[in-house]
Amino acid sequence: MSRKTPIERYRNIGISAHIDAGKTTTTERILFYTGVNHKIGEVHDGAATMDWMEQEQERGITITSAATTCFWKGMAGKFEEHRINIIDTPGHVDFTIEVERSMRVLDGAVMVYDAVGGVQPQSETVWRQANKYKVPRLAFVNKMDRTGADFLRVRQMMVDRLKANPVVIQIPIGAEEHFQGIVDLVKMKAIIWDEDKGVTFTYGEIPANLTDVCNEYREKLVEAAAEASEELMNKYLEGGELSEEEIKKAIRQRTIAGEIQPMLCGSAFKNKGVQAMLDAVVEYMPAPTDIPPVNGTDEDEAPVTRKADDNEKFSALAFKLMTDPFVGQLTFVRVYSGVLTKGDSVYNPVRGKKERIGRIVQMHANNREEVNEIRAGDIAACVGLKEVTTGETLCDPAAVVTLERMVFPESVISQAVEPKTKADQEKMGIALQRLAQEDPSFRVKTDEESGQTIIAGMGELHLEIIVDRMKREFGVEANVGKPQVAYRETIRKTVEEAEGKFVRQSGGKGQYGHVVLKLEPQEAGKGFEFVDAIKGGVVPREYIPAVEKGVVEALTQGVLAGYPVVDVKVTLHFGSYHDVDSNEMAFKMAAIFGFKEGARKANPVILEPMMAVEVETPEDYAGNVMGDLSSRRGMVQGMDDMIGGGKSIKAEVPLSEMFGYSTTLRSMSQGRATYTMEFKHYAEAPRNVAEAIVAARAK
């Protein structure tokens, strides 16, 4: 089966927006227009199409599907058919991980801004992540019909806040309730959409009151295009006009290189401008073949690349897992190279496992289509994969490659959860397992002692949302404990002789174990080490493993506050035994007593997790942010200027002081600062803090 659409006519894009900028309406309108134009040859009344639009709104497919495929021939129907895959990017960036995972598989992004609110904090965060993955983008200023809409003010905000380089390619005709259409600065024509949901439109002359502003921005557009090459620049400087073709080609080249961002406008709600934005996606966004080959490593860890080509060996990245009520688990994949056919076996190098693809489905706006194969550049969902988690590679078993992994941080905060009823018990286990598969930054374990289920994640909000999803998606009601920090204990002093005795001899078979241990602190991160230094058989060989077992058990509960003990070296160097009464149990108990006895004398201390915190903030708030971090026992380690303005402040702060930080930071910076936090290392807690921790545990 050959390709239906050549890969050069593919566009894999994300539509990214602050919560209120109108992303859903924009996406729905895209699906509506592409749906209509795809079926343009069929005779049907508008009602049928609109029906599915209403139904879409009820079913919310645009919102739930991680990737939707649609087709576009241009608003005048003059393009060859292009295939546009829209990857959903979350509107809420409390989970930067979600945005990162979509940015990782996109080739280009449409940034939607509200014509009134402009560039909001959330937009800044998404912009930084797009910078990190070098994603080409264009800007669509939506809601031009709102009171207070101001297109050129949003342009200025993009320059000031994002340090973007927007190139205006459309000027709005009117604004607020007078918004009628746009002027296309490449064609220098006005475009007015009809009232039939914007399906038809007419070209006209530029309104007289806009001539000056259109000429000014047309000049800037041509200048931006001329900078694409020396040849064009010379032509421009010699006063030659650049053709429409030359301008488009140059703007495309510079957009894909990340040097400029074409800027458009419209009102999705009023059916104006979305069609021209789709044209811009086709004209200025990259095809999979326009971006560099993807990097990975082979089985010997040697670097390899995979080109976007059907003839290469198959490689893909699983970027999202979803549970579908009809087909079970869907694994959304982006194919980077080669072809995948239904029934093929794929290899997952991260887990070292082969799995078979049951079915492959592609989501279209109003239906899902089963397909037999997917090729380089495609995005689809696979059914039948059981072992894959987000961010893992799938590849041809005969040509193993591991694509660059998304990095998921270690969890640092935990909470106990317990089901409210017996009926919730079983469902909770299934729910937590599913959620952990979908989100690699979330972990589940069972507390040995209390038997409680402990969930661990990246922060308070993360765990709140997990508990909320258990209730919404799996119907599990759970009670949640208070967030807990994972403290540790260690020792600071060497104790030469720590004696442990376990003796029970009162008639009949007794118990007798006796050990003398030496305890020494190890350097941080070295872990636990056990040394057998018994001479002359004072402790028989067969009991030595029991002594080590006892010490390991004692390590699980420190003497200060019962936290696990780390970085200790224990040497067994003396002891005694009884021919009849000694046994493994007795020596294990003796070792536990000996270790606890020694630990008390060895200057025990509490260790707390230290977090590397990085705050990105507009300059005005930098002083307050630094002061606040210091008040949280933070060590500010440096402040850098950010590409794109603002300051990046790096600090090391104890995790226990970071609870509630997102709320404080939000109010301190009016929502404009963002922060990331990841575990760095354990450090000794100051005495007053340690005393408070011990007192809290003693309650």
From Swiss-Prot:
GO cellular component: cytoplasm
UniProt key word Nucleotide-binding: yes
CDD domains the UniProt entry points to: EF-G, EFG_III, EFG_mtEFG1_IV, EFG_mtEFG_C, EFG_mtEFG_II
Gene3D superfamilies linked to this entry: 3.30.230.10, 3.30.70.240, Elongation Factor G (Translational Gtpase), domain 3, P-loop containing nucleotide triphosphate hydrolases, Translation factors
UniProt binding sites for GTP: 17-24, 88-92, 142-145
UniProt-recorded Gene Ontology molecular function terms: GTP binding; GTPase activity; guanosine tetraphosphate binding; translation elongation factor activity
Location in or out of the cell: Cytoplasm
InterPro entries named in the record: EFG_II, EFG_III, EFG_III/V, EFG_IV, EFG_V, EFG_V-like, EFTu-like_2, G_TR_CS
PROSITE patterns: G_TR_1, G_TR_2
Domain tr-type G: 8-289
Keyword line: Cytoplasm, Elongation factor, GTP-binding, Nucleotide-binding, Protein biosynthesis
Gene Ontology terms describing biological process: ribosome disassembly
NCBIfam families hit by this protein: EF-G (TIGR00484), PRK12740.1-3 (NF009379), PRK12740.1-5 (NF009381), small_GTP (TIGR00231)
Similarity comment: Belongs to the TRAFAC class translation factor GTPase superfamily. Classic translation factor GTPase family. EF-G/EF-2 subfamily.
Function: Catalyzes the GTP-dependent ribosomal translocation step during translation elongation. During this step, the ribosome changes from the pre-translocational (PRE) to the post-translocational (POST) state as the newly formed A-site-bound peptidyl-tRNA and P-site-bound deacylated tRNA move to the P and E sites, respectively. Catalyzes the coordinated movement of the two tRNA molecules, the mRNA and conformational changes in the ribosome.
Name the UniProt record assigns to this protein: Elongation factor G
